[in-house]
């Protein structure tokens, strides 16, 4: 039996999954971590990356031995995935030059706007190229020493293999991709170099960006140093082949088998984003719509919101804390299930309650920062059912505003495949999202495995693919042929209730603007 390892560094958890050649999960391990807000920047410390990789692999290896009775000694392929975008730069000796600036930051507005106008292509603030221009334009002390700019997935892949490469889907969140060549767009690279010329830097853009590879290509092998980094016990041997590292968007597409034109998926966890694979790339400049690619290079339209479940999780933790103080500490899974299910019996419009869940800025609604808030009027129907429903609607609201833009552009999709934390409690998030987006929402049993499973599948494809076998055929015929899919269609009451909720939500955004202006973050 061939065993494939997938590792994903998510916003709140680093997860490792081992699968067989048919995609069946064999063992898993994980490590919880959180981003830090330091000196005005959302970041993670790279020492925590090392710790998280080791702990998640250690837990996976123990889980494998417990389940199968033998130690995990041979792995046939490995893949690494992580949160896309951000800014992670190193010098020639691979010393870190600046704090890791994650996707969550909204500090590059001027650079993103300038690049959008220069390229005629929407460049979001979280993209690596926007962060690079921001650092150069600001005259930051490290810019002349940059030898390598990469993402978190690219960084970890380099540490394990010594190869400075990324998958094309991951690359599309660094710099725009030309889907006819599956490489960085040459015209935009040239324009970027021209913009930076006045700063007399010792490098050109392509000098510092990772090489772009497509799904199925070999991306290097586990080095001795990489094996020790992942497994300090020495049980893991060097020489294991790697697939190209991909971002959470690409692994989400793979995990839901949504990589063919006119298919789509929605990932709902710490952030929320919907991706629809297109027949051909959008040509119109849509500043609030991101244009990325699948792991095979097909054009994708993405609607992205920085915050989804963070505020929900904070409230659930508050309820848990209250119950614990009363001497009745709850089972977290049961607490989530109870609270989420209560939302299904609330008033369709949440009884006049409204929540703004912004923990960070949001491009779609033009916020540079966020302040989570909850508002009600004296005559609101303030019940736990309506409260939870308002929190769940808020988690979907910004996505809905972006999806409306795609509807205006006549981008169509028959259904969206959902995955992520919002769907862990069966039915609830799926049903409310179907009504909110007025689109059927489907969930696969396997989608709960998430991005670590998705990148493990890409590792399996890279190693076992037959001659001329496409990723689409591999997934259709070998992984998802017998997949169980649950689909929920929009409910008219949910749809009408969400529309009423959105009217209050849009009005409450003015309160949010005042909160951002008046309440400062320490």
Feature names for model-found ranges:
Residues 102:
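Conserved phosphate-binding/catalytic loop of the ribokinase/pfkB sugar-kinase fold
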Residues 81, 89, 176, 209, ...:
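Active-site beta-strand/loop segments that form the cofactor-binding cradle
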Residues 10, 93, 212, 271, ...:
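Anionic group-transfer/hydrolysis microenvironments
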Residues 5-6, 72, 110-126, 130-166, ...:
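Active-site core segments that coordinate phosphate-bearing ligands/cofactors
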Residues 1-99, 113, 145, 228, ...:
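N-terminal glycine/serine-rich phosphate-binding loop of ATP-dependent small-molecule kinases
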Residues 105:
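Carbohydrate-associated surface elements
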